[in-house]
């Protein structure tokens, strides 16, 4: 499957054992070329499919497939701490499993803004992801059990810091490509 075959990719969610999803792309689940309503199929498999953050915040247990945005989630300046809240909501739901859980959180727009060489938006997305990971580390420290791993599967854009002033909290960055590079992502 090619990454551009979005409708085929999201159809696989119906067969997946995943317990919690939050993100954008609602348009790919309804009004499809194949006529399927994936939200209805997910509900038939026991998923709750809230259409807003308010609906999601009221859910106390069970499988959740929350894709309230037609395309992408809002820009960082418009969404506030949405990624952190959605991540912590998922943790609250998944943590009810006595066997534990695995959760993957992706800062998906980081890749897009790397391809676009948009340093301002890349920094906003990075800051949002950092805040989210900070909230998760705080939760993990309180809980005492979880292992939190942060990594990247590749780098995009060839971002290099070429100047700035640490005291002022400013930096100057340059990009060398709009493509993915073969660099291995670090693990923290």
Language-model segments: residues:
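A post-motif C-terminal structural segment
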Residues: 2-188
